[in-house]
Curated annotation (Swiss-Prot):
UniProt modification remark: Specific enzymatic cleavages in vivo yield mature proteins. Envelope glycoproteins are synthesized as an inactive precursor that is N-glycosylated and processed likely by host cell furin or by a furin-like protease in the Golgi to yield the mature SU and TM proteins. The cleavage site between SU and TM requires the minimal sequence [KR]-X-[KR]-R.
Site (Involved in binding to the cell receptor): 138
Prosegment location in residue numbers: 455-456
Listed GO CC annotations: host cell plasma membrane; membrane; viral envelope; virion membrane
Signal peptide: 1-98
Protein's UniProt name: Envelope glycoprotein gp70
Length: 688
């Protein structure tokens, strides 16, 4: 009987059979993977890409309609140029979302309404100082704009005076009033050269009316400022008479504090006081008639009460504003805000009517009055002026109004609102993704220090060409984004630069060397404001990239409601509820500027820069390249030795398997039962 072969041929051949059985499964998996790749490549093609809508004529018509609506709202005449500018405003870039900071914008190209509560004096120059007093108008520069639409806000009731019979809400009505004063006749035979007779001067002047429901005589006990003394104490009879019968009376800067006339604005709270009436409650006509012979048979006006007759001269009607107190009984302790020269502006709205002593006819005197920089006059029809109080703020709007700096009798049918160019505003601007810095040199050092770190430089080399391309691409994208996001701050900077240069050139042309004292005073006042702006600029740390505005280090909270900023730009300065308290913002900016000065360590920055430059020395890089070379050599050696070690390990495992087979045969046969020649060699598995 032939002997069976040693071992188990079925079991030993299972290793090969199992491998053959697994191949169909691997092929199926590979096939499925190929199908999935094809499907994945088809999915992007199946995505529907929206077709970009082409610009059609209907779109252009819609844009033109929006631009025409902008011109209509702003009351701007429609021309090809204005329509093009309106289209640019409609097609303006979207708002940017970079870093926002508060910017200090000196002398901005905007106008704010002036309230009666403003303590800044409004200076008025006239061409008839002989009959109106004050300072002469040597300018002769009278400017009038076209129709504009004005919108503003004020903390207090705006200064609004109506020269028409119709009065807008919040405005005061004016009327003709009679001012009388008498001067002595000349008699050289008498002591002092004064005769026994008196000469009466009669002047009809437009001022606040003293009749009607909005006028009340209220005794007042409050003391006026020392600048306004009692007329009967400060100016005696004939104190300014110089012996010239043709010289009109002088205007006296005094008051009668024991009597006062109050005027109320139409439909609004607050009072305007006038202490220039010597006898507000008694008509002085009867007293003058009783002394008719003394005044050369002078007869007072008929059907017109006389309350402003004073022997020493004409008393200037200084107006004092009083806010309505919360407690009606606390009126005597409410502060009064004086307005000393506004009466001259009102007087110029109509001709002066003068009756000289000894004349029967009245003389019409045309008059003009101008406000000085930075004030202007907004003229408009009463029905087109709207003053509305919302909460604690007055909203002012005027349609088809004109801006001017002077008034004359042509304004008799209009109402006037005083506006002012503010010395500065705080405007939030966007500077993009770049950091805020006030010194370009220091910022350059910082940039260089960040870029020359040795470890980052070596890491960039190891990354390879693809990584370098990605880094360059990211820098290019960041630069493009930075340029786009800086549009807001750049626009404000360029706008203010253009306005500043234009106004400076115009001012140089207008202000001639032969300007009189008043023009020189205006220049000095404006230079004083420029010095104040420069002082603020020098004490505040500003962004180095913007020269015509000061981008402060105070961040702007972009989540704030823009209406608060808009209210500030329209005229609200000190109201935390609806706007910002500008004084508090200014203090915060000053504190941050001081902290920023202390935070800059120039010595530390220089040392850091020196260390960074030292790290870029090629001799110092040798150690890094040595380490890299040693590491690469070790890696090559390991890769070369690994196949040899793996082959030796496979042979060892093969020998161990052979020894195990021999031991199994010995156990089955009970020793060395089979000769070596008859032993069947078992199939071996190759590990190589």
């Amino acid at each position: 009987m032939p002997k069976h072969q040693s071992g188990s041929p079925t079991d030993s051949s299972d290793l090969l059979l199992s491998g053959k059985k697994q191949r169909p499964h691997l092929a199926l998996r590979r096939k499925r993977r190929r199908e999935m790749r094809k499907i994945n490549r088809k999915v992007p093609r199946m995505n529907l890409v929206p077709i970009k809508e082409k610009t059609a004529w209907q779109h252009l018509q819609a844009l033109i309609s929006e631009a025409e609506e902008v011109l209509k709202t702003s009351q701007t005449p429609q021309t090809s140029l204005t329509l093009f500018l309106a289209l640019l405003s409609v097609l303006g870039p979207p708002p940017v979302t970079g870093e926002s900071y508060w910017a200090y914008l000196p002398k901005p190209p905007i106008l704010h309404p002036v309230g009666w509560g403003s303590t800044d004096p409004i200076r008025v120059l006239t061409n008839q100082t002989m009959y109106l007093g004050g300072s002469p108008d040597f300018h002769g520069f009278r400017n009038m704009s076209g129709n504009v639409h004005f919108e503003g806000k004020s903390d207090t009731l705006p200064i609004c005076l109506s020269f028409s019979f119709s009065t807008p809400t919040g405005c005061f009505q004016v009327d003709k009033q009679v001012f009388l004063s008498d001067t002595p006749t000349v008699d050289n035979n008498k002591p002092g050269g004064k005769g026994d007779k008196r000469r009466m001067w009669e002047l009809w002047l437009t001022t606040l009316g003293n009749s009607g429901a909005n006028t009340k005589l209220v005794p007042i006990k409050k003391k006026l400022p020392p600048k306004y003394p009692h007329c009967q104490i400060a100016f005696k009879k004939d104190a300014f008479w110089e012996g010239d019968e043709s010289a009109p009376p002088r205007w006296l800067p005094c008051a009668f504090p024991d009597q006062g006339v109050s005027f109320s604005p139409k439909g609004a709270l607050g009072l305007l006081w006038d202490f220039s009436l010597p006898s507000p409650s008694v008509d002085q006509s009867d007293q003058i008639k009783s002394k008719k012979n003394l005044f050369g048979n002078y007869t007072p006006p008929v059907n017109k009460e006389v309350h402003r007759w004073y022997e020493a001269g004409w008393v200037e009607p200084t107006w004092f504003w009083e806010n309505s107190p919360k407690d009606p009984n606390d009126r005597d302790f409410t502060a009064l805000v004086p307005h000393t020269e506004l009466f001259r502006l009102v007087a110029a709205s109509r001709h002066l009517i003068l009756k000289r002593p000894g004349f029967q006819e009245h003389e019409m005197i045309p008059t003009s009055a101008c406000v000085t920089y930075p004030y202007a006059i907004l003229l408009g029809l009463p029905q087109l002026i709207d003053i509305e109080k919302r909460g604690s703020t007055f909203h002012i709007s005027c349609s088809s109004c004109r801006l001017t700096n002077c008034l004359d009798s042509s304004a008799y049918d209009y109402a006037a609102i005083i506006v002012k160019r503010p010395p500065y505003v705080l405007l939030p601007v966007d500077i993009g993704d770049e950091p805020w810095f006030d010194d370009s040199a220091i910022q350059t050092f910082r940039y260089a220090t960040d870029l020359i770190r040795a470890k980052r430089f070596v890491a960039a080399i190891i990354l390879g060409i693809s990584a370098l391309i990605a880094i360059i691409t990211s820098f290019a994208v960041a630069t493009t984004a930075l340029v786009k996001e800086m549009q807001t701050a750049t626009f404000v900077n360029n706008l203010h630069r253009n306005v500043t240069l234009a106004l400076s050139e115009q001012r140089i042309i207008d202000l001639k060397l032969e300007a009189r004292l008043n023009a020189l005073e205006e220049v000095v006042l404006e230079l004083g404001q420029d010095v104040a702006n420069l002082k603020t600029r020098m004490s505040t740390r500003c962004h180095a990239n913007y020269d015509f505005i000061c981008v402060t280090p105070l961040p702007y909270n972009a989540t704030e409601n823009w209406e608060r900023t808009r209210a500030h730009l329209l005229g609200i300065w000190n109201d935390n509820e609806i706007s910002y308290n500008i004084q508090e913002l200014t203090n915060l900016i000053s504190d941050m500027s001081k902290q920023h000065i202390d935070a800059v360590d120039l010595s530390g920055l220089a040392q850091s820069f020196a260390n960074g430059v030292k790290a870029l020395n090629p001799l110092d890089w040798t150690q890094y390249f040595i380490f890299i070379g040693v590491g690469a050599l070790l890696l090559v050696i390991v890769l070369m030795i690994f196949p040899i070690v793996f082959q030796c390990l496979a042979k060892s495992l093969d020998q161990v398997q052979s020894d195990l087979n021999v031991l199994l045969l010995k156990k089955k046969k009970g020793g060395n039962a089979a000769p070596a020649a008859e032993m069947v060699e078992l199939p071996r598995v190759s590990y190589t």
